[in-house]
């Protein structure tokens, strides 16, 4: 192998343009102010450029570094052949590298030496240049030492002055000789000079990673604060997180109902620069793979149904977009570089009611579509499609949608695991995407197989009932006796079925329900008959549940609910899901609970969808935490809620926040025959406008325990509008006339009434006028005028309507659509409680396509959940539970509050926990969960959790509850949250914990805005807590907080007294005086008493007291003292 020689070449300079990320200010910013050519920057090598250099350059570099001549010098001088080679004394890049250049010129020449480097996004950047002439020493080998100086950012680590040292991939030192006889100018360009080289050579220097380099001695003294800050981070080595191109878009089954809602996912840019550079380079040559599991129930009922598609920042379909057609084919659409769209349809149809995996690989213009059936991935179909067009692909400039959206409906079925390989085109054998939740997936398949049998049985029964009913009507058309029999007699039933005993034994509850069903009530439309029969089975089951001992019958009712669910009546599916998830008088079974929740969600059952949305929002009951998946379920119900509210039919009621612990609110609940309702009716009849309005609202929306009765409500609206001249009643009646809700439309009268109400200053009526001109007259200028006026008056509907004008691009004087301004109006409307405005805001938060609404999936879920929980069907369940509670029907109250609480609405969760506290025997007997703990715990994780729920959980953590152990730390957190919400009991409980010796952590004090530096001991903290407790107490008289505060200060005062030096001195002084006085007193008493005399016996002692003789004075004084001391009576 030749190790040294003249004329060796090097790889041709790369002409590939650098990735666009390095072009511009960012690349220039990494160049130091002096000594470095412009354009050198970055930290890691460009992958493609580095591969080219390492394959070619290093091998030649190793051959020429530190080389010796193979040809003797004498022979070289005789040959007079130009050559050049050099020796680098240090193989690493240093600040000053010494290079020995040996060369020979046969003619006058110029010797050129250059150092070029390659960084992350740049190649062949010169950092050192030197040239010199040789005109005299010809035909002689000469040596010159050159000190090559490299920029500091290539040699040293980051420090206070070198802020961005660069990572260099290759450093090449090259030299060449050119002759001067051609007459070229000395100042000719280096690149042009290089082309005329007669001898050239190069070597490759070894680079040092940035964090292995030494620090540079700048010989500058930093200020102490700057030096201290720098020393804190001087030795920190940043680490890039492990990142790859695989994205798991979905890991848990998603029940797609075939409606205009779906899962929204957004890809971020890669944090790894090399991956990001690769992604950018492939924008016009997409290389990626999609792998997803599907279980289809039906093919698309429209032209196209969404499976997985990309929506760009302009709200247009991008690459890729995969849809399902009516016939069962796949429709795959791509966006071209030239701006057009291109689509292709597969040659095969995908299977129904089978779990299968769909793999789609893109590799430039080639698409490979593969379907595999079952968990063993049995091959089903494979198709390769090739195109000559260039596809445009930018997976970060928009968002992906799984299922439906406002642009297209989704499929009817279930999505399984979905993986996306962003930078790789893989063969199906290379894809790792197993069917997760295998048991659940198998249960879904078994459910629909069983339900196919049930639906066939019901369909045949409905057909037989239809023909039997027709024969009876034809034979007995005018028989009055039979009419009476049909009306008052026992219903006619079908006694014989064309099924075998084996099938009857397999579905006993179904055949029992069909045998007991009235033939004449079966619908004639066979397509609707299965669902309606399921509804009748459900109604009979619910009637049994509503009895006195309804919960006791659940186990026998479950089979009937199962049959009802199979018939497509998915209220039964939700009941079953709740029964299994809570263990409501059935063995608790999480798998079955998930199954029926998903089945109900797929059937678009409102409570089931809310249940799924809540479980994924909180990540509870073995459901994974997934806000995008939660949003898909909540948004489905939220979009239906405004429509449901304007639907007069259906079991709906207004969702009211009524707490069972609030006796005052419970007292005003009424019914049509209740005292409150009768009093309102009496006042309304007398012409009281407020009573008429309230009565109409209660009847129209079904509020305060009154059943929904739109017809009666409209009568009161009309009476109030025409008699009392109340603007609110006039407006309400005008809206009813405009929409024809329960009354014949009368646009003319409605407009007159609307103008009349607006003239009275009602902002709703001003907004109504704008709505009239927008909807009926298409006069957008007048509509905007009224809406702007109503918005100034504080009407949220007007804000929403103005947003619609900007969104549609029809706002007068403003050309084109303005989504940013529309979003601002929608946000203002949402803050005023407008449902549609809230929905638009949640959509903006989940997509992140507007700068004013940065992507925030959690906030999107919260806003969609807020609207969904106003749904009237949920309100109906809550109202039934409340009515049962007021009537003392504990079984029914527990049932309906469990059903409502599992949807995630806070008021029902706290009410259910309250019922379980009132009737713990009922909860223990029928529920398979710790009712009090579960639902108070759920409630404290709500956005608008009440303070008493925090107090309850604090007590449960403090005392421990059933199987839950005591946890003082969590108890402190719960009390602190209650205190932060302004509840005085929270402050009081925290103070009691401190009295017991519990230490409140500093972060809790900071949370309560108690400065730990000002309150450094427990006494000062207690004072602050009791003072806040007193200030937040709403009791006018003495409260426990005020008494506790007073007691604390008395203790402090007494403690201060006992520990005072003055008190000790005074006490000692007084005690000394008392002792001295006592001693002096006893001394004086003892001095006044005479010495005792010996007693003399007298024979007549017994009679001496009765003697009339007067005793001498001395004797009298001697006898007087013992008489006084022994006499218990006062002297006379």
From Swiss-Prot:
The gene is SEL1L3. Sel1-like repeats lie at residues 575-609, 611-647, 694-730, 732-767, 768-800, 801-839, 840-877, 952-988. PANTHER family: PROTEIN SEL-1 HOMOLOG 3. The lineage of its organism: Eukaryota, Metazoa, Chordata, Craniata, Vertebrata. It is a single-pass membrane protein. Pfam families: Sel1. Glycans are attached at residues 201, 382, 527, 937. It comes from the Eukaryota. Residues 1119-1132 have a biased composition (Polar residues). Its main location: membrane. Residues 1097-1116 have a biased composition (Low complexity). The chain crosses the membrane at residues 1057-1077. SUPFAM superfamilies: Concanavalin A-like lectins/glucanases, HCP-like. Keywords: Glycoprotein, Membrane, Phosphoprotein, Repeat, Transmembrane, Transmembrane helix. One of its GO terms (cellular component) is membrane. Residues 1-24, 1087-1132 are annotated as: Disordered. The modification Phosphoserine is found at residue 608. It is found in: Membrane. Signal peptide: none annotated. The keyword Signal does not apply. This is Protein sel-1 homolog 3. The keyword Phosphoprotein applies.
């Amino acid at each position: 192998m030749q190790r040294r020689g003249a004329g060796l070449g090097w790889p041709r300079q790369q002409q590939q343009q650098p990735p666009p990320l390095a072009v511009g200010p960012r690349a220039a910013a990494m160049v130091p102010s002096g000594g470095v050519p412009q354009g050198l920057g970055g930290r890691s090598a460009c992958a493609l450029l580095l591969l080219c250099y390492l394959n070619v350059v290093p091998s030649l570099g190793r051959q020429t570094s530190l080389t010796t001549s193979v040809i003797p010098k004498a022979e070289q001088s005789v040959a007079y052949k130009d050559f050049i080679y050099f020796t680098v004394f240090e193989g690493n890049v240093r600040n000053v590298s010494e290079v020995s250049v040996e060369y020979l010129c046969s003619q006058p020449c110029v010797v050129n030496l250059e150092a070029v480097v390659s960084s992350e996004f740049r190649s062949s950047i010169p950092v050192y240049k030197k040239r010199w002439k040789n005109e005299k020493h010809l035909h002689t080998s000469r040596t010159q030492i050159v000190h090559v100086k490299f920029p500091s950012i290539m040699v040293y680590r980051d420090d206070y002055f070198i802020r961005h040292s660069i990572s260099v991939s290759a450093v090449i030192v090259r030299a060449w000789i050119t002759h001067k006889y051609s007459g070229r100018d000395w100042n000719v360009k280096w690149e042009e000079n290089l082309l005329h080289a007669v001898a050239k050579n190069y070597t490759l220097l070894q680079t040092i990673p940035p964090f292995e380099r030494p620090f540079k001695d700048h010989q500058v003294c930093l200020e102490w604060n700057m030096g201290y800050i720098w020393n804190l981070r001087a030795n920190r080595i940043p680490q890039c997180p492990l990142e790859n191109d695989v994205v798991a878009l979905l890991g848990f089954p998603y029940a797609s109902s075939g409606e205009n809602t779906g899962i929204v996912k957004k890809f971020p840019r890669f944090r790894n620069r090399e991956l990001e550079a690769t992604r950018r380079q492939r924008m016009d040559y997409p290389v990626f793979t999609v792998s997803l599991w599907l279980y289809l129930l039906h093919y698309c009922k429209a032209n196209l149904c969404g499976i997985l598609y990309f929506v760009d920042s302009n709200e247009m379909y991008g690459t890729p977009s995969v849809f399902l057609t009516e016939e069962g084919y796949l429709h795959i659409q791509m966006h071209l570089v030239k701006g057009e769209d291109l689509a292709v349809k597969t040659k095969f149809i995908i299977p129904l009611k089978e779990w299968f995996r769909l793999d789609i690989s893109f590799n430039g213009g080639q698409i490979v579509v593969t379907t595999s059936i079952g968990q063993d991935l049995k091959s089903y179909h494979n198709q390769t499609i090739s195109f000559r067009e260039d596809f445009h692909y930018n997976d970060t400039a928009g968002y992906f949608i799984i299922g439906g959206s406002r642009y297209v409906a989704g499929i009817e079925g279930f999505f399984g695991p979905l993986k996306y390989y962003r930078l790789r085109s893989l063969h199906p054998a290379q894809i790792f995407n197993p069917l997760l939740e295998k048991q659940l997936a198998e249960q879904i398949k078994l459910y629909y197989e069983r339900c196919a049998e049930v639906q066939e049985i019901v369909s045949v029964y409905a057909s037989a009932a239809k023909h039997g009913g027709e024969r009876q009507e034809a034979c007995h058309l005018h028989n009055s006796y039979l009419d009476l029999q049909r009306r008052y007699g026992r219903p006619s039933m079908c006694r014989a079925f064309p099924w075998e005993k084996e099938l009857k034994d397999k579905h006993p509850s179904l055949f029992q329900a069909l045998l007991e069903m009235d033939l004449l009530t079966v619908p004639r439309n066979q397509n609707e008959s299965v669902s309606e029969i399921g509804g009748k089975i459900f109604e009979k089951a619910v009637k049994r549940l509503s009895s006195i001992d309804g919960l006791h019958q659940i186990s026998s009712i479950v089979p009937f609910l199962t049959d009802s669910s199979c018939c497509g009546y998915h209220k039964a599916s939700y009941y079953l899901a709740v029964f299994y998830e809570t263990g409501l008088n059935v063995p608790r079974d999480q798998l079955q609970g998930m199954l029926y929740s998903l089945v109900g969600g797929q059937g678009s059952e409102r409570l089931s969808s809310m249940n799924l949305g809540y479980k994924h929002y909180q990540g509870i009951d073995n459901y994974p935490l997934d806000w995008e998946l939660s949003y898909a379920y909540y948004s489905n119900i939220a979009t239906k809620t405004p429509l449901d509210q304007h639907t007069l039919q259906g079991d709906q009621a207004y969702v009211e926040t009524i707490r069972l612990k609030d006796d005052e609110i419970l007292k005003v609940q009424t019914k049509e025959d209740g005292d409150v309702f009768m009093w309102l009716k009496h006042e309304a009849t007398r012409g009281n406008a407020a009573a008429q309005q309230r009565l109409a609202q209660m009847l129209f929306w079904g509020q305060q325990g009154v059943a929904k009765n739109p017809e009666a409500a409209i009568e009161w609206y009309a009476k109030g509008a025409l008699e009392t001249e109340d603007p609110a009643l006039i407006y309400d009646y005008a809206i009813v006339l405009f929409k024809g809700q329960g009354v014949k439309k009368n646009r003319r009268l409605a407009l007159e009434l609307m103008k009349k109400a607006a003239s009275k200053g009602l902002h709703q009526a001003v907004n109504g006028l704008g709505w009239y001109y927008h909807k009926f007259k298409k006069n957008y200028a007048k509509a905007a005028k009224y809406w702007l006026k109503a918005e100034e008056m504080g009407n949220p509907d007007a804000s929403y309507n103005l947003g619609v004008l900007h969104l549609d691009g029809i706002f007068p004087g403003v050309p084109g659509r303005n989504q940013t301004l529309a979003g601002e109006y929608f946000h203002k409307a949402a803050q005023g409680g407008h449902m549609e405005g809230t929905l638009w805001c949640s959509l903006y938060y989940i997509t992140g396509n507007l700068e004013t609404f940065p992507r925030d999936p959690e906030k999107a879920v919260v806003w969609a959940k807020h609207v969904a929980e106003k749904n009237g069907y949920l309100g109906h369940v809550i109202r039934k539970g409340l009515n049962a509670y007021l009537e003392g029907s504990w079984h029914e109250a527990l049932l309906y509050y469990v059903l409502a609480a599992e949807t995630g609405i806070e008021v029902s969760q706290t009410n259910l926990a309250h019922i379980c506290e009132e009737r713990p025997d009922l909860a223990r007997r029928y529920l398979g969960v710790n009712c009090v703990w579960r639902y108070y715990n759920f409630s404290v994780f709500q956005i608008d959790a009440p303070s008493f729920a925090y107090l309850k959980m604090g007590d449960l953590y403090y005392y421990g509850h059933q199987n839950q152990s005591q946890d003082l730390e969590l108890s402190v957190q719960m009390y602190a949250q209650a205190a932060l919400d302004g509840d005085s009991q929270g402050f009081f409980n925290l103070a009691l914990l401190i009295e017991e010796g519990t230490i409140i952590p500093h972060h809790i004090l900071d949370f309560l805005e108690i400065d730990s530096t000002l309150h450094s001991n427990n006494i000062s903290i207690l004072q602050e807590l009791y003072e806040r407790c007193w200030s937040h107490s709403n009791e006018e008289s003495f409260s426990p907080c005020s008494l506790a505060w007073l007691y604390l200060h008395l203790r402090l005062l007494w403690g201060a007294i006992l520990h005072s030096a003055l008190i000790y001195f005074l006490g000692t002084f007084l005690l000394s005086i008392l002792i001295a006085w006592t001693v002096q007193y006893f001394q004086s008493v003892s001095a006044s008493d005479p010495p005792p005399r010996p007693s003399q016996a007298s024979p007549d002692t017994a009679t001496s007291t009765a003697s009339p003789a007067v005793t001498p004075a001395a004797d009298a004084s001697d006898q007087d003292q013992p008489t006084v001391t022994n006499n218990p009576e006062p002297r006379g």
